[in-house]
């Protein structure tokens, strides 16, 4: 369903009717620049996301058309006023198309620069995000594009869309007879379908079914390399990887095809180093090794025409431009240059033709295009007041804490900040133990905790972030003093990789970014699971365990954006606590400042989620009705309860109350 609508949303302060003096605008620009550095927006945002003069996140889906941008905070508020439920995914199909154009352009420049005569195709692996909006946005971009399938279901989706691309189809993954027949049917229909052999057991079935269908199969071979990347996804490449043939098996495959008279069917060489390759050196090493396979296969009489380097093109989630797990130390041009040069160099050295180069760059195409937006439903601040001095006969631990507090305010003291902090921590530890054994009262425990928070705040004020010796203490205190923000979303459903492999995603408020980030926060979801928390956040050039936050009204906190969740997250999300898919809207931004929004996914209802676990909503409603009727409640109240139960069954799985803040 869609609620296709056009909104003339403003893209600048002037169009909002907000008048500011030149001095105010200049000050906002300075603060915006500081926020860009704090959250590294300039790097992970990749010109798609920025901070405008109002201190709001703005989105420019096509950086080649900079006047086409939208204020995301204003867009969300407008949508809310029109009935949009949160959490919701705000998807920008124009970003998908720009990413595809950018990668294609990088390889075009590389081919021209190195005199490379072969073609290039980006083949989109739909496993990264199989949603129709993604596949069809890419197909309708006007750019050359192939599609990759890794299962029967994916192959059916690919074949159904193949008529719109007339390009390349690559078939990976485990294959049974039905999968293989589907691929061969696609070839018979006139599509260029490459069946990539990843297990020796597949080739006999391929040859058998090709004969049955009277079709010449178009085959590829996935070679298992010794080269391997590093990081969270390294196991998908290298000698121990799940897929691919070892060198001996590659030779066996060649001989099997030669004996069957089908050696000319083997036309594609495929390898995969791993997903999200952080270091360009690892990519270059792997391509050089795979180029040797290309050379050696030609020596064996195999006319390889396509060189599929697989995935690996990473994105900079951190914005640190480094080789850490969630970053990359290279850009699109360097990636394309390394691949084209390595393959071209091997061809020139051995007098071989330049093959068509294929990359399966799904993450790099899709990650940026989706933002999860949600509301904060509760804030727990570490508020404190400095307590008065303890009574004269108070236990020693209380007196010791008070003495440390007084010493912190005496001029000329020689004790270090760390020593003050450690002393107060030891005293508080003793008090907690004493409380458990009955030595300390509840009032005394509360007094000690308030004084400890006061001490932490006092130490925090005297620490210098530029002093490397202070960093461990700063991190410790930021964790201790951070606000707890309860956010209306499920980490397991919307960002499963943040939970499963500790992947970092950019998270920040959508507004208030023209202010100094004076507070720190940790974000907690609404699942009944202590793992439902985000553990790492962007903080300048590093990663922190708390999120920098500008000052905000705890009674009206800002909305939060979870960025770069367009790759894998929607597909991998699980049903923990029966929280379902969120609503999703597609946003189109035009140079005249107008915006069109289409509802692409209504989100799951409670009934939808119950049916997934074989709980029939109608049966549940009947069972609840039977219970209500057995009560001594009056008829009007019974009817009210039944209506509320039924409305809940067909309502959103997330919190919907207008007065949610707790």
Curated annotation (Swiss-Prot):
Cofactor: Mg(2+); pyridoxal 5'-phosphate
Protein name: Biosynthetic arginine decarboxylase
Enzyme class: lyase
Reactions that this protein is recorded to catalyse: L-arginine + H(+) = agmatine + CO2
Subcellular location per the Swiss-Prot or TrEMBL entry: Periplasm
Keywords: Decarboxylase, Lyase, Magnesium, Metal-binding, Periplasm, Polyamine biosynthesis, Putrescine biosynthesis, Pyridoxal phosphate, Spermidine biosynthesis
Family: Belongs to the Orn/Lys/Arg decarboxylase class-II family. SpeA subfamily.
Record-level GO cellular component terms: periplasmic space
Presence of the UniProt keyword Zinc in the record: no
Recorded metabolic or biological pathway in which this protein acts: Amine and polyamine biosynthesis; agmatine biosynthesis; agmatine from L-arginine: step 1/1
Modified residues (N6-(pyridoxal phosphate)lysine): 127
GO molecular function, one term: arginine decarboxylase activity
Top-level division of the source organism's lineage: Bacteria
Pfam families (UniProt xref): Arg_decarb_HB, Arg_decarbox_C, Orn_Arg_deC_N
InterPro entries: Ala_racemase/Decarboxylase_C (IPR009006), Arg_decarb_HB (IPR040634), Arg_decarbox_C (IPR041128), Arg_decrbxlase (IPR002985), De-COase2_CS (IPR022657), De-COase2_N (IPR022644), De-COase2_pyr-phos_BS (IPR022653), Orn/DAP/Arg_de-COase (IPR000183)
Complexes and interactors: Homotetramer.
Biological function: Catalyzes the biosynthesis of agmatine from arginine.
Record: residues binding substrate: 307-317
EC number(s) reported in the record: 4.1.1.19
